[in-house]
Amino acid sequence: MSEEPEPAAGTFRAEARDWLRAHVPAGPHPSVDTAEGFEWHRAWERELAAARLSVVSWPAAYGGRDVSLLDWLAFEDEYYAAAAPVRVGQNGIFLLGPTLLGHGSSEQQARLLPPMARADEIWAQAWSEPDAGSDLAAIRARAERADGGWLLSGTKTWSSRAAFADKAFGLFRCDPQAQRHRGLIYLMFSLRADGVTVRPIRQLGGGTGFAEIFLDEVFVPDADVIGEPGDGWRIAMSTAGHERGLSLRSPGRFTAAAERLTGLWRRTAGAADTAGAACTTGPAGTAGLAGPAGAAGTAGPVGGAGPAGTATADRVADAWIAARAYRLHTYGTAARLAAGGTLGAEASLGKVFWSELDVALHETALDLLGPQAEIAGLDGPDGRWLGGYLFALAGPIYAGTNEIQRTVIAERLLGLPR
């Protein structure tokens, strides 16, 4: 298929591009991991919602535009190209929202999706526990039957957005006698409810994007159960498919980063090679990489003339090519889904690819910057690479470790024995 499918290259893309150019605030943007920054991003989400651009692929009744999956990818391309703010509502918009559309009741959809789209309710994930991370089926937090609902007890950890979010969704054990993949229930609950304690987790960069959630007999009504008790695992795997596959890691994120990386290479290393550099042109008219053809034996910055410079230029090129390859893969997956296909174990393949690509992009950028990256400050243009690198390191761990994903690939895609 072509890199830019026709449905994703029409008037909607142009409309989104024009709106984003007119409305995206100049950077640097506040950190989403502080109370003030969190509310700043909530206000941005509300601006998107007012333009009906916060959940473009959702039904119009819930604040969306009913656009195709390919048009959604086009919007994501433009969003990242415009250097727009981080989506503070991503857990709801990209994970819980699609889960409710696929498995929730009509009452739940009507009650929960509109405030989610407007950022009136921002959601946290409540999956991992101190003794159950990628092995999600090992969870111990329990849901016990009560009159009209359930009582939740236990601990969740590494809950993204939980420090400042309004509500959370997650998996709990409702039948301790059942096999570990059974007896699970998918529940939603308020982080302001009686019995809930949230303790922020400070990260490498100083932010608190994750938190622990302590639950002490927290009441959740039956209306906030997704699906049936005992069927939680199947529904959770639907959510995980969105996290590992299309929804959280749209290709626009990586193509935009790859373009920034090539620009950084020209600004730092490429400057040393100006006298002898040859410029090539990349696919679809995109500017390619300047060749590292400096004077032999001349010392220069990382990536400059000589063998070391050639190696760095190769890494930049490899990352750029990988970002384009992921883009093609994702558009292909979207076309297959649009034709009635499903997102299965291949989501694990995509998760391994994008998480390792993210690390490669940021590692290469830091090598180009050298010590400057450590003193630039996280809020500056070069500091974005350091902050991005610290977060990218978690990519092979969250959403199911890459070791787990490779096991899924081996068993379910390749048919290898356990």
What residue spans do the PLM features occupy?
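Amphipathic, small/basic residue-rich leader segments at the start of a protein or domain
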Residues: 1-88, 111, 115, 247-248, ...
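Glycine-rich beta->alpha junctions and the first turn(s) of the following alpha-helix
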Residues: 5-7, 196-279, 301-325, 395
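C-terminal helix-coil-helix/basic helical segment that borders enzyme active sites and/or dimer interfaces
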Residues: 28-35, 324-380
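Internal helix-loop-helix
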Residues: 49-110, 114, 118-120, 161-167, ...
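Glycine-rich phosphate/cofactor-binding loops in nucleotide/flavin-utilizing enzymes
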Residues: 68-70, 74-75, 235-237, 369-418
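A short, Trp-centered hydrophobic/proline-enriched beta-strand micro-motif
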Residues: 119-127, 171
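A structural signal for short hydrophobic beta-strand segments in well-ordered beta-sheet cores
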Residues: 141-144
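A short core secondary-structure module
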Residues: 149, 153-199
